C-alpha cells in the first residue's frame, strides 16, 4: 500500500538556491557560474518575503550564508533540502529528465549567437524562403514577431530564433505562411537537428495572426520534440497503470512519453496554478502523480536579468501556495523544487548551474526537518518507491524520511 495516494511535483522553473560544486565548469558571458545564487541574490539585493514556503522550511535549507530575508523555522510544517545535478547540462530538458531519473551525459546544444549558417541555408533551400538573419539569436517570442512580423508580411521571409534552451523556433504569420507549410518546414528542421553539433531538444512552430503593432500568437503551436533516450519514472508509472498528469510544458519536455493526462500549456504561472488546483480536484484522480512546470520565473525575469520582477513572481506563487495546500487530500504529498538556476543578478543571460531547493509537505506528516542533501533524481526515486515501481537510471529514495 502506498504511503501517499497522490504526489504533486511543482517545478518553479530556474529557482536555484546557490552554486553547485561544479558550477565553475559552466559559464555566462565568459563568467564562471561559481558565484551564482538565484534565491540568495534576490533575497540580498531586492528582498524576498515568502512566508508560506518559509513555513515548510525554505529558510532551513543548509547554505554557506542563510537567505537574508527568509528566516529559518524552529518548527517547520514539512521537510526541506537541496539537490545537486549530475548531468552535463543546465537546460530545462536536462533538469527535468534528470529529475525523472536519467543521467544525461551528452548535453543538448544551445546557440547563444544564433544558429550556424549551414543550418539556416539548409532550411532556406528546403523551404524556398529566405530567413531573416537579424532574428537568428535568443529572442522573446512576442518581441521577435513585433520586431520582424511587419517585414515577414512584406517579404514572406522566415523568422527563426532560439532561447536559452536547446530549441529552434519558427514564427510565421498564418496569412503569409500557411500552417501546413510551417509544419512541413519544422519537420525538416527537426530532421537536421538530431545529432551534434546541433542536437536540439525541440523544434517549435510559432504561428501568429494580426497586424503590425497588434500581433497575437495562436493556439496552433506545434512542438517537434525528442523522447527521453530511456524510460523515466513517468514511463514506469504509466506502464503500471498509474495516472500521470502533466501541467504546463511538461508534456512537451517529455514528448508525451509516460504521460497519460496532458492538462495543457500554461498562459502564465497563475493559470498554471489554476490548472494544477483543477487537476487536484478531479474526482477520477484518486491515485497517481501530477507534474507541473511554472516557467514565468525563468522566461520573464531570469533571462531578462530582472531581480525585482523575479522577486514579485516568487511572492505571487507564495501567496497562492495556501490554495494548493487547501486542494490537497489527507494522503497527498506536495513536492516543490526547480530544474536549474537563473540568477537575475548574474553576468550574461543564460541559466546558472545551481543546487535546487526541495520542499515537501503533506497533511499526514507528524514529523519535520531536513532531508540529507542529495541529487535531482532522488525525487523520481521517491515517487517510484511510493508507488511500487522501478526507478530509472539513477536516484535514491528519501521516502523513509517523510513521516
From Swiss-Prot:
Protein family (similarity comment): Belongs to the phosphopentomutase family.
Pathway note: Carbohydrate degradation; 2-deoxy-D-ribose 1-phosphate degradation; D-glyceraldehyde 3-phosphate and acetaldehyde from 2-deoxy-alpha-D-ribose 1-phosphate: step 1/2
UniProt-listed InterPro entries: Alkaline_phosphatase_core_sf, DeoB, Metalloenzyme, Phosphopentomutase_DeoB_cap_sf
Organism: Streptococcus agalactiae serotype V (strain ATCC BAA-611 / 2603 V/R)
Protein name per Swiss-Prot or TrEMBL: Phosphopentomutase
Cofactor(s) essential for the protein: Mn(2+)
Catalytic reaction annotation: 2-deoxy-alpha-D-ribose 1-phosphate = 2-deoxy-D-ribose 5-phosphate; alpha-D-ribose 1-phosphate = D-ribose 5-phosphate
Note on how the cofactor is bound: Binds 2 manganese ions.
Entries under PANTHER family matching the protein: PHOSPHOPENTOMUTASE
Biological classification of the source: Bacteria, Bacillati, Bacillota, Bacilli, Lactobacillales
